[in-house]
Amino acid sequence: MLFFPLARRGRNENESPLRGGLRAVTLAASVSLGALSGAAVLTVAPAPVAAQQVSALMQSIAEAAAESKDLTAFYRANGYTPVFADDSARARARRQALLRAVQLAPEKGLAPYDTTLLTADLRAIRSERDLGRAEVAMAKLFLDYARDVQTGQLVPSRIDSGIVRQVPYRDGVSVLTNFARSNPQAYLRALEPSSPEYARLLREKARLEEVLAQGGWGQEVPGSKYEAGQSGNGVVILRNRLMAMGYLPRSASTSYDADMSRAVQLFQIRHGLAPDGVAGPGTLSQINVPPEERLASILVAIERERWMNFDRGQRHIWVNLTDFTAKIMDNDRVTFETRSVIGATQPDRRSPEFSDEMEFMVINPTWNVPRSITVKEYLPMMQRNPNAAGHLRIVDRNGRTVPRSAINFAAYTPSTFPFAMKEPPSDGNALGLVKFMFPNKYNIYLHDTPSKSLFGHETRAYSHGCIRLQQPFDFAYTLLARQTSDPEGFFRARLNTGRETVVELEQHVPVHLVYRTAITLPKGGMEYRRDIYGRDEKIWQALQQKGVQLRAVGG
């Protein structure tokens, strides 16, 4: 498949002892890069026999690497030859590049690394055995940094059960082998995500850190509602905050004028609110969010970018759950966008986060009612009234229709009910008139819906987990345009038959269900969305436990 790695493994495997619980101490100021990377590292008296030197060094490296399968395999393959701790120019370049990258880790949204033990090892080198221990300590630090900056500091599934994303963890042996063969600075840079979103998030992180250093965005806005024509102290405070946030040009005006209405509208658009230009309770609550909270959202988004550090597809479908939209992207450009309805906020209805490939669409689909909905919702209804949900067929294990009169619903429990339920194709079908399939074990897909009124809501979390589309026909036309000259005619000819019809996509399209509360704009600026499932709050708490910090950094 286009974007899934062949090798994956748990993130906590082979954790380095260099990273203690705090991991908050950066390189000691008294230890310069030059001191750590220069010839002083190698003040080892030569032994009489070269073979004895090699033997002691090999033994030391083997012992120090024994707790890590990756390091053991790497050093066995290279004959236990140091790649960091010798006096060659290449080894010095590797040390310098790694230590510099580690020093700058907080600028990348990573927790600072505690290199106290490594510093002590480097200073204490007096023998070949010391050299071997220092070599492996550097290699462990490299692998820790490489995994953190490349695929994230957290294991997503351990944060929230709805984050079922497969992170593309790289094989440690290959990463270390390729590093040893490459320009070290270039290789370390290449570990980071290459997406434009990641680069823009880092820039916004730096900007917000400077905002914090300058004292923030000023006083919170009091009151509950402001609108055009008003003036007074509250309006002045609101104007000042909008100016500090960059939504309103500097001026001496003290009234809620047309410029201020436009600024509020722009703010509302950027925060997923109805753009009426009135600063009501919902808008004011977002205006009063402090920059610290926005910076935390940026740091979470950076971590999420690392979880998706793979090729997302030249054409792909991007469903941002918090934004209630579904987009078709071509070369990082939105070529189609529609509103969506996502899973409700109840824990068992929330839409999961994962990536897959769309393979086909079904026109005039039958709704095979999920087992959970059948026994939790419809069975109790039919126990009260056997004729309830009469639009649904009841079928046995062989797919044969069973008349309701033949079923004693009261005799069954959710675990013993032996039947399934289906809804035939129709305008009122729960899936509407088309569904888009990327087969997965979560039974999640995109589809039409007869409940069109929900798309007019600001917050659209109502489904059982699947993604409903406001404009499913146009979505289908955009997908089909690559395999037929008349996509609308092709689609409607099959729709008009009323029969269930499967249409294969000649080229499968990657689908990414994501959850981003901080979203950069290609031409500059940010958009923010509410953390409707509470997932980002969990991620931020976990990042803080790892040692990630909010920083105030002057320009």
Task: List the model feature ranges, each with a label.
Residues M1-G20:
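N-terminal secretory signal peptides that target proteins for export/translocation
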Residues L2-F3, A51-D70, F74-R76, V136, ...:
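Well-ordered beta-sheet/strand-loop patches within structured domains
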Residues R8, G20-L22, A51, A56:
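N-terminal, cleavable Sec-dependent signal peptides of secreted/periplasmic/extracellular proteins
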Residues A24-T43:
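Bacterial N-terminal signal peptides
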Residues A39-L42, P46-Q53:
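Boundary at the C-terminal end of the N-terminal hydrophobic targeting segment
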Residues Q52-Y169:
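Cationic-aromatic interfacial patches
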